[in-house]
Amino acid sequence: DTIINESVPDCYADLGYKTVSTNPCGEIPLCPYDSCRLLAINLFSYVENPFTKKASFNFKLFKEHVAAAQRIMDDIIDLELEKVDAILAKIDADPEGNEVKGVERNLWLNIRKKAEEGRRTGIGITAEGDMLAALGIQYGSKEGNNFSEEIHKTIAVEAYRASVYTAKERGAFTIFDSESEKDNPFILRLKEADEKLYYDMLEHGRRNIALLTIAPTGTTSLMTQTTSGIEPVFLPVYKRRRKVNPNDKNVRVDFVDEVGDSWEEYVVFHHRFKEWMEVNGFSTEKNYTQKELDKLVKKSPYYKATSNDVDWLNKVRMQGAVQKWVDHSISVTINLPNDVSEELVGNLYLEAWQAGCKGVTVYRDGSRSGVLISNDEKKSEDEQDTLTPFPTKRPEILEADVVRFQNNKDKWIAFIGLIDDKPYEIFTGLADDEDGILLPRWVEEGLIIKNRNQDGVSRYDFQFENKRGYKTT
């Protein structure tokens, strides 16, 4: 088993550090009661002169920041222990007897023991895909895989160096035993990469039982406006639509739907693709046609480097190369088309194992509902739709529910048009205001009627039945 054989904490399995499971995304194999703190370093931020011929990676600054990050992670463990102590103090102060609160108290004591004893950290990265593009290196290529391996080797050596340095100052994690780790493949790779670091570790120990991981960093990448984790870019550019009023000044109508509503199309750029455009003199304000967008992508370093373009086997091999320098694990997803064969999926799993991956996730398009939805999904001929088909043309009259709600300090009202008791459209506005929508508070339902003025502009009226049975619009 690759995890057990490569795991540094599993060298201490006899002391309770045998891996039994992982966190939900799989990047942290854990023993019972243990936990891990995660931190992600933005690789793109170390590329100087990105998207130019002078682009380079600042390894000097990168090494300094890796060391600082490891120090921060160790400090966070102490802060975490303070919080656990506060929880234990609260449990002790509670009026219930030990037979009631004993289980919870023992749980937190075990969590505290593992955190203090092993001091596990999880230094990771994000923006690997953007970093490679900014350097002019294609994701998934041999050059790209080699450079990624060098990056993660650097992280491993510098993070472990920082942990050894901190051990000199603060002491090693309490169960450190160099004899238990002497045959661990990861530790031996560190020895080969930097013998001085290895012998310093033999002399002083290190502060943390394990230090490295690569998480999905989905939310983190939204903050950094980069690709996530070790993944390539999903799409560098795509088009969206927004509804517009055709009578507004300077409005542009690109599409009119079946019910006569007008839409404007606009281009959404991946932030770093937009930066590439600006560096290379392409306008980011122009309304490009799809053909023009395709030509732009073809000129960019993101060409043939999206999640759908990258060769699946090469991606697995890249993960395996990087995994050699990550003492925990890596969260990676291989996106496959719906019609992929079982044989190919089997080959990917086998290749992942042979490449040295500790885990791999395969997602087949459409294999789970509500996860990812593609535009080209098709129903099988023998599949019967039990739901009423969604109308391609809006009925003139829709039943509607009325919902009143508070928006900060303002009172609002919403009219929800329904088809088969499911929301189809929503109109909202201020309520109980001179300029708002005046409607008796007892009205909870009615009709939304679509009409056209003499000038052809659509309008929507709400109609309800008053207490005397008369229709009011």
Q: Language-model segments: what does each one mean?
A:
Residues 26-27, 73, 77-85, 187, ...:
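Catalytic alpha/beta core of large soluble enzyme barrels
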Residues 1-122, 219, 249, 428, ...:
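Structured mid-domain segments that build the active-site/substrate or prosthetic-cofactor binding neighborhood
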Residues 65-112, 116, 138-217, 225, ...:
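Internal maturation/activation junctions in enzymes
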Residues 1-8, 84-92, 111, 171-181, ...:
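Short coil/turn segments at secondary-structure boundaries
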Residues 40, 119-134, 150, 219-222:
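Contiguous, well-ordered alpha-helical segments that form the cores/surfaces of helical PPI scaffolds
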Residues 124-127, 159-163, 330, 345-348:
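Extended, hydrophobic alpha-helical segments in both membrane/secreted and soluble proteins
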Residues 192-203, 374-418:
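Short, Gly/Pro- and small/polar-rich lid/capping loops
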Residues 127-131, 147, 162, 473:
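A general alpha-helix detector
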